Amino acid sequence: MRKPGTHETLRGTLVKPHPKPAVVHAKPKPIALLPGLPPEVAAALRKHELVVVSLYDPQARVDQISLAEASAGAEVAHAGFVPLNVLRQRQTGPLMRQLGVVPDPAVLVYRRPGELVARFDGFADRDTVAQAVVNAAAATP
């Protein structure tokens, strides 16, 4: 201890901190998806176990309502959501090849790795969409 009023330096040893070992995290496995899905749906399935897909015509008023309801149902059920414009061949072409003709509006529910678990041709309200997601989640193997 120093005497008050002196300018002596304190003597002591410096304690060097021990370096912490680097934490190595396991690299996540890539998610394998079924081929033939639209790129937007595949991207959503990489982030979410279940994804709601809404097929809509932007020029049809009822399709806009259906799109909003499907989005709300997906949000309530904590699922991914993908709107696909039926007037854009690049977006809907892969689904048409898999499912044949799909009317608009339509709501599809997919589960990883790309399995279609629910399909609603025509209007589906938010409660119906949310319940379909909940049912699909409960049936997940």
Locations of regions flagged by a protein language model:
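Thioredoxin-like thiol-disulfide oxidoreductase module
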Residues: 38, 71-75, 79-121, 128-140
